[in-house]
Amino acid sequence: MSVTRLSFPYGESIQWHSPDQIPQLPPSPFREWLLASGSLTQKLKSHCNQFEVKVLGEAMLPPFPGELPHQGQAWIREVLLCLDGIPWVFARTLVPGAMMDSAQDNFLSLGTRPLGELLFTSGDFTPGKIEVGEFTACDSLAKLIDSLEQESHHPLWGRRRYFSHGDQQLIVSEIFLPKARQLIDRLA
């Protein structure tokens, strides 16, 4: 796996919808993974011997148009969540500048620790509803997937969730990579 020839950020603009607005969600067991209400980090950890976060990049950057309305800059962190050396999830986090002013230390000190541990254990964050999206990767995300040597035979699925911290909200988007879909489908 070599992502060094690519450049951060890798994410792309995705249309997200409430699960009840999607005419056909993927079949089980993948559907349960997509809609799991708890920590995806914990769910992933329970299915491997070694869990690893590979940080692809983090910086103050402008979000995609419509991704985080009314924000000029956001702290954006992109990571791969790997199970036993295999990248399963591409995750993109957007933290508004105002939230960074009040909670900067929480985020900048993460390193290779999963953000899910902070969001679900600190008591400072309240998870919101899950939105889902189905899409075909293009541009940077497609190049990232190619560099991971993962072939996609299906459109990609992802989920997005807002987490409240006081009167601010951050966004976490998690895209299930092709290998994850293949391995989850085998769990049936």
Curated annotation (Swiss-Prot):
Record-annotated membrane-spanning stretches: none
Pathway in which the depicted protein is active: Cofactor biosynthesis; ubiquinone biosynthesis
Subcellular location: Cytoplasm
InterPro entries, sorted: Chorismate--pyruvate_lyase, Chorismate_lyase_/UTRA_dom_sf
GO biological process, one term: ubiquinone biosynthetic process
One GO cellular component, as annotated: cytosol
Major localisation: cytoplasm
SUPFAM superfamilies: Chorismate lyase-like (SSF64288)
Enzyme class label: lyase
EC nos: 4.1.3.40
Keywords recorded for this protein, A-Z: Cytoplasm, Lyase, Pyruvate, Ubiquinone biosynthesis
Function: Removes the pyruvyl group from chorismate, with concomitant aromatization of the ring, to provide 4-hydroxybenzoate (4HB) for the ubiquinone pathway.
Family stated for the protein in its record: Belongs to the UbiC family.
Stated name of the protein: Probable chorismate pyruvate-lyase
Protein species of origin: Shewanella loihica (strain ATCC BAA-1088 / PV-4)
Gene name linked to the record: ubiC
